[in-house]
């Protein structure tokens, strides 16, 4: 089970410095946190000069603390007219502050700063605090300045989380409490993990100059030297990654190499439109190809869908992925709305009801055991659920305060609108196969062999057809029919917010109620059936006892059928596809392969198999693909990325000798 997050306690000393009662040490020098950040970390890493030579520049910090190093770096980036196009700041923190404590600490530090060489920082404090995520374990990606500055927070113990990151770092801010106060953060294991993430020209800087730290740096392949410390401190350490021997088996991720930043996305549902928006935001020109005459015509065309995280007592992979996807989606959706691309979604929460008293107790115990913050989920007794929903319920459940319902088609349209003139659409055309030419560019061909479009990169995001178009034999997915039912006004309890459990009920405009959905594997009938409506009515009756399934004529009801694409392990397929032909040629040498050993289909990516969780997973999946293409820090732990890697089935087949 993932360790729960224990927040930091905010304490000020008489001299105004912020101190940690847990570690018995200060967060910054009494001479000023921002001045310290500028002297030690920014100038110690040769910034801002060094980032001027990169399209994207990545910094890793080993302790976020009050956020002053990030704020000072962000301000320095803003003040530099020749700054890099995108700045990535990745910071690990075991004990993050709660939102308002962070705001108080950072605002206090900024108010007493004496630094004058960089742009004003006070306006940035509120931006950071307002975007501050729920204190849950894992990776949290925040974006500022229209996405040009990205803060990737990693909440957890550095010893555990650093080996699980996927990125290429240009600079390291080695910050944290003194080695004598927090020895684990300065242990050899930390520096070995950092060495696996270092660019060949990576630099580092740190306030400390202890002998133990110097030895650990040297053993990990970093060359160091002493320079004048901050505020009268005799020395601090700076240096660069300069290994004298091989210190890693795999190189950190690199950007996809191409002279033309153009891409094809096949499939204009939730998966594809999310990819379009994320690539266009990075300057890619995208051609979106959809076999229907308009976007979001398949399962994404449902009147509404629900979104919420999944909670499991053991915090398994699916639960962690859903939490990461849910929180990332909320962040991105708010950014779309702020940019003027509004879409229809409810904002009053969502209730998940238990199906038995025993299940309710397990649900309540899971929240307590995991330390789930109330802003994410809270237990709801039966009486409280009745009062909130204004109707009878059989059991209590969970309240997801930020969950709700959304129009998938409206979201897809907003994402395409955000792409602006970087998006070209081709509709009413079905792609039969893909072909990579001798020039390294991919061509999307129709059934006659005609080239519909060509580009450096292709993302297949067309659900159950994706594996066929990409020529994958080792990507087992299944089409699952789902029928939903629309109930006329006044025929169902008028719940004020979406309710899920054994099925779901969503209040729509004009008093209409949406309920569903059936789950019918390998059923290809696209016509709504009376039996499906009856099943949905019976499910609704179990969910809300005040409703009677027999009160309505199932044969007279309207509805819709969509088809989910579900992988055999119930997790999506997101990321760079494996090169199955190359793997077959090298099969004898790959029987013990890991995912990083498998040959890849250069420039070919997948985003499919989202099942019923497209709203939760599609935005995060799109960010992962865009990060992989552009060589940016991944927005989730490597362990989670590997759990949804499309090549995972190829690896399993290789291990069992089934690839030839």
From Swiss-Prot:
Keywords: Cytoplasm, FAD, Flavoprotein, Methyltransferase, Multifunctional enzyme, Oxidoreductase, S-adenosyl-L-methionine, Transferase, tRNA processing
Its EC number(s): 2.1.1.61, 1.5.-.-
Cofactor: FAD
Role according to the record: Catalyzes the last two steps in the biosynthesis of 5-methylaminomethyl-2-thiouridine (mnm(5)s(2)U) at the wobble position (U34) in tRNA. Catalyzes the FAD-dependent demodification of cmnm(5)s(2)U34 to nm(5)s(2)U34, followed by the transfer of a methyl group from S-adenosyl-L-methionine to nm(5)s(2)U34, to form mnm(5)s(2)U34.
Protein name in the entry: tRNA 5-methylaminomethyl-2-thiouridine biosynthesis bifunctional protein MnmC
Localisation per UniProt entry: Cytoplasm
Annotated NCBIfam families: MnmC_Cterm, PRK01747.1-2, PRK01747.1-4, tRNA_MNMC2
Pfam families reported in the protein's UniProt record: DAO (PF01266), Methyltransf_30 (PF05430)
Listed GO biological process terms: methylation; tRNA wobble base modification
Organism, scientific name: Burkholderia pseudomallei (strain 1710b)
Similarity comment: In the N-terminal section; belongs to the methyltransferase superfamily. tRNA (mnm(5)s(2)U34)-methyltransferase family. In the C-terminal section; belongs to the DAO family.
Region (FAD-dependent cmnm(5)s(2)U34 oxidoreductase): 266-660
Region (tRNA (mnm(5)s(2)U34)-methyltransferase): 1-242
Classification via SUPFAM superfamilies: FAD-linked reductases, C-terminal domain, FAD/NAD(P)-binding domain
UniProt GO MF annotations: flavin adenine dinucleotide binding; oxidoreductase activity, acting on the CH-NH group of donors; tRNA (5-methylaminomethyl-2-thiouridylate)(34)-methyltransferase activity
Gene Ontology cellular component list: cytoplasm
Lineage: Bacteria, Pseudomonadati, Pseudomonadota, Betaproteobacteria, Burkholderiales
Gene (name only): mnmC
Keyword hit for Heme: no
Known catalytic reactions: 5-aminomethyl-2-thiouridine(34) in tRNA + S-adenosyl-L-methionine = 5-methylaminomethyl-2-thiouridine(34) in tRNA + S-adenosyl-L-homocysteine + H(+)
